[in-house]
Amino acid sequence: MKQDIHPNYQPVVFMDSTTGFKFLSGSTKGSSETVEWEDGNTYPLLRVEVTSDSHPFYTGRQKFTQADGRVDRFNKKYGLKDENANPDA
């Protein structure tokens, strides 16, 4: 392996800019901003827009939409009703 060609891998604190949630992880990305972590050490701080704390998929606020199939689109396009559909169900 060649010497001095690999990026510096270090512990970094990532902070969600929308919720303020922070977590410590390893990264090759650095920053001039620093923050003191719970263990008393100072680490570079990287601000990110979305984390598992704010993403709708992980928070349960995501809305699922049912995509219409080909038959449904055809029926909607030509104004046809499904006679087999049970409106009471």
UniProtKB/Swiss-Prot annotation:
Q: Does the keyword Ribosomal protein apply?
A: yes
Instruction: Name the protein family.
Output: Belongs to the bacterial ribosomal protein bL31 family. Type B subfamily.
Query: What's the protein here called?
Result: Large ribosomal subunit protein bL31B
Extract the HAMAP family matched here. Ribosomal_bL31_2 (MF_00502)
A Gene Ontology molecular function term of the record: structural constituent of ribosome
Q: Which SUPFAM superfamilies match?
A: L28p-like
> Is Ribonucleoprotein tagged as a keyword?
yes
What keywords tag this UniProt record?
A: Ribonucleoprotein, Ribosomal protein
Spell out the subunit comment.
Answer: Part of the 50S ribosomal subunit.
Name the GO terms of the biological process aspect.
translation
Q: Name one GO cellular component term.
A: ribosome
